Amino acid sequence: MSQKYLFIDRDGTLISEPPSDFQVDRFDKLAFEPGVIPELLKLQKAGYKLVMITNQDGLGTQSFPQADFDGPHNLMMQIFTSQGVQFDEVLICPHLPADECDCRKPKVKLVERYLAEQAMDRANSYVIGDRATDIQLAENMGITGLRYDRETLNWPMIGEQLTRRDRYAHVVRNTKETQIDVQVWLDREGGSKINTGVGFFDHMLDQIATHGGFRMEINVKGDLYIDDHHTVEDTGLALGEALKIALGDKRGICRFGFVLPMDECLARCALDISGRPHLEYKAEFTYQRVGDLSTEMIEHFFRSLSYTMGVTLHLKTKGKNDHHRVESLFKAFGRTLRQAIRVEGDTLPSSKGVL
């Protein structure tokens, strides 16, 4: 899996920049920006690696002796380290603008290895800095830039923005039999819109969203003039894929879930978002159809979903009424999924380190 990085400017972003000469060359000039340490700790917990990148005009010259820089800088690094903040690398350009070097921000010389490795998650990596050159660096790297400002985009705001999860996925699946469009928002409730062409199936899918505590939009055009087989099967495949994508790296999720009774039915559902597809299913129905949905396709739907979502799923129901038996399965799955996808921490719930 590619790595999320934060490339962070030093003066004016991590520590205050003296307005008189823009040099932190004495200990009394060293002051941290408000909230920087707790927010960096939060960002590390969210899986970001930190890289400091800074222009230090004329470092090592008479106007800015190396020793004057080293004292405050080393103290700053010691304080960061003592509080648990770890920088993978500190990148410094010591040149003046007149030197026309190739390593001064916004040029990308200092960060070339991150661009070449193809191991950086560009969609979720950022440059954070207080100057236009930092934003230009981000553009040159092909990632997003965040313009730090104590009032308009301070460290608590940045921490909230980058750790807030909007777990969303959009999957389009087109075959000769079906055209399916699925969108899933795991952290939003209500407003689901579902149209598969099979009315009772729409109702069942809505039960998953309602009891799962998330929103989804599903539009399906299938070969219903034949039967509902391809429509139900392919919807399960597309929905499972969307749920898997929306879960992302699964960091902090509960992972497991359980059971739900309904009316005279007792539905049992056990779910493990394990990365290992498996379905155990036990349900018997009196009739071949409930509404316009084939009862034999219910198992097929959950098997398809568990396969593409990568989950271990156990489903069982018993009761007297087919409608209630079917509905109990979908409600139980939704309620169980609600528990399993809930975020309650920052760590991956696996001793293997991968799900």
Swiss-Prot record:
GO terms for biological process: L-histidine biosynthetic process. SUPFAM superfamilies: HAD-like, Ribosomal protein S5 domain 2-like. GO terms for cellular component: cytoplasm. InterPro entries: HAD-like_sf, HAD-SF_hydro_IIIA, HAD_sf, His_synth_bifunc_HisB, HisB_N, Histidinol-phos, IGPD_sf, ImidazoleglycerolP_deHydtase. Mg(2+) binds at D9, D11, D130. Zn(2+) binds at C93, H95, C101, C103. Pathway: Amino-acid biosynthesis; L-histidine biosynthesis; L-histidine from 5-phospho-alpha-D-ribose 1-diphosphate: step 6/9; Amino-acid biosynthesis; L-histidine biosynthesis; L-histidine from 5-phospho-alpha-D-ribose 1-diphosphate: step 8/9. This is Histidine biosynthesis bifunctional protein HisB. It comes from Escherichia coli (strain K12). The lineage of its organism: Bacteria, Pseudomonadati, Pseudomonadota, Gammaproteobacteria, Enterobacterales.
